[in-house]
Design a protein with these regions (language model features):
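C-terminal peripheral helix-coil segments that are non-catalytic and often amphipathic
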Residues: 1-8, 100, 107, 143, ...
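Helix-turn-helix
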Residues: 23, 31-65, 69, 73
Length: 215
């Protein structure tokens, strides 16, 4: 037994089955980072994981289920990273915080774009992926991302640091603008999209700045 196989079987929690399943998901995720989803075969995954082809079917119904598990896990990690990167309401300045929010959203879209892009060649798997991340039990898609940004805006509004504008609209503007910048960046249009983030935030801030009372 090779060291790699032994490590996968033994794991850290003493459960060989769980450890091997995790090893298969890790392997699939690594392959997805290097190749298009429609080029990955069951044999490719098995060879990379150093197991026989049939082992995959002890844990997953088929190759698509394994790839879907890896894709959803990766996207879950991206959403969780977004949540940890957002600033605490009331800290620093609103201008600086919104720039951090925009930057975090841009990074999320930039990392997620290749995932969704690779799935365009596999419509059935794309449909399953979208259903999984928007499931009612554990929404990980646009709703959770939007709710996270809305919560930050509302918290700043309660502190009087942002005007009482529609927080959902503010979140939509930030999410939509950063997604567009990532998309146009992949098309190679215009200057570096990251350089355009400050202008997006400045425009939003002008609409959200608290109105000063006239004396």
């Amino acid at each position: 037994m090779s060291p790699r196989r032994a490590q996968a079987v033994l794991g850290t929690d003493g459960d060989p089955a769980a450890a091997l399943r995790e090893h298969l998901v890790d392997t699939a995720e690594a392959l997805l980072a290097e190749r298009q989803v429609n080029t990955i075969t069951t044999r490719d995954i098995a060879r990379a994981a150093n197991v026989s082809d049939g082992v995959l079917y002890n844990y997953f119904a088929d190759k698509s289920e394994l790839l879907l598990t890896a894709l959803v896990r990766r996207f879950t990690e991206l959403v969780e990273r977004l949540r940890t990167e957002l600033p605490d309401p009331g800290s620093g300045t609103v201008d600086a915080n919104l720039r951090l929010v925009a930057g975090a959203l841009y990074d999320l879209h930039a990392a997620a774009f290749p995932i969704v892009g690779s799935l365009l060649a596999e419509p059935a798997l794309l449909h399953r992926f979208m259903a999984a991340i928007h499931s009612t039990d554990e929404p990980l898609g646009g709703r959770q991302i939007r709710d996270t940004v809305v919560a930050y805006v509302v918290a700043e509004q309660k502190r009087g640091r942002l005007a009482r504008a529609d927080p959902g609209a503010a979140a939509d503007l930030l999410i939509g603008a950063t997604a567009t910048l990532v998309f146009t960046g992949h098309l190679g249009e215009g200057r570096d999209p990251v350089e355009r983030l400050p202008a997006v935030v400045d425009t939003l801030i002008r609409g959200l700045a608290p109105q000063r009372r006239k004396r």
